[in-house]
Amino acid sequence: MDVAVVGRLVTVYGVAVAVAAFIAAALSDLWGPRRVMVLGATVWIVLELLFLGLALTTDTGWLIVLTYGLRGFGYPLFAYGFLVWISAVAPPEDRATGVGWFYVAFSAGLPTLGALVATVSLSVLDLTFYGTLWISLGLVVLGSLTALVGVRERRGRRPLVDNPGDVLATVTRGLRLLRDDRRARYVTYIRTINSVPTYAMAVYFPAHVTGTLHWPLGRFLILTTVIYAVNLPFNPFYGRLGDRLGWARTMFWAGAVACAVTLALLYAAPLAGRSLGLPDGLVFGVTLVCGALFGVSLAGYVPLSAIAVSLDPGHPGAAMSTYNLGVGAAVAVGPLLVAVLHPLIGATGLTVVMVGLYLVAAVLCLALRGTQPGFDGVPAADAPASAAPDGATGPGTRSAASSPTP
């Protein structure tokens, strides 16, 4: 399949991820995060079995799209249900740090271990792509059992709100928050931009690496592994830094601005090196360094989830739904940008667009100042939502003093 076709297929998957990521938070308020995680693991495993055992073996096009797409409902329910769980039980002053540790595990799994397993399976064990997918399913089962059996915290095993019987109000609270508080929308936009390049690069960068740079596909997998392996320790680091120096300030400099600069370097450095006739090994080494810097910069967005919860601390699931929507939207928007723009402007144009998006995110980060107690003139005892941006009086305008903290 060419780049545009892959982009369309992954976009279908991404739409499912976006929907599931949003409802994972609302359902966590309603049912409790652990039940949402069980549902997510079940959906993924069952649909992956259908995808591998039936759709691919019969080469049925519509069934491949259906099972691959619906499978996208699984992992957000599991992963972001767990993120809501952490956000609900972490003390406010350490919330960004707790989220940072979540992303240590997330980055160690999906992009890092995933790329490493693919490298070993394809290059060392000489398995096919199909065989590698079966190995990935085994890892999903193992990881699901580890989380569901190993985590014993009690609050996440029950609804996070006091009135779970009011199903409609609980499920739609996140939507009302998006409607009434523009900062909630900014959270969604920033979180989408944070991950759009990584999902887009997964679609168009392999062809760029093999076709333009004339490197083997294994080098793309190594680059991906380096980006997310280096990212790991900086997730809790930037979480702690945000808790101590300011969430919005950390995101602006360490996240948005740094991502714009390092993504540009990651794309331009190998092209410049080859045009100058530098040794291939040196060019690849410089590319890995740029990739590592990009991985560090991606961690600069960790404090964003703490900002999301601060907008409605009495309903952490609803508040996190605005953040999770951005996570899921990135899975769809990234490949969609590739499908639409790659035929028109190529890899270079796409990269310029994504650098521009990071600069837009930097501007939006400035609008989130004043959401952290103890910073930007907000008293430490007060909630960040004392002044509603849209003149709203609904969710997102409550103060921590009048709302139970998670």
Regions from the PLM with identified roles:
Residues E153-T188, G391:
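Juxtamembrane intracellular "pre-TM" segments in multi-pass secondary transporters
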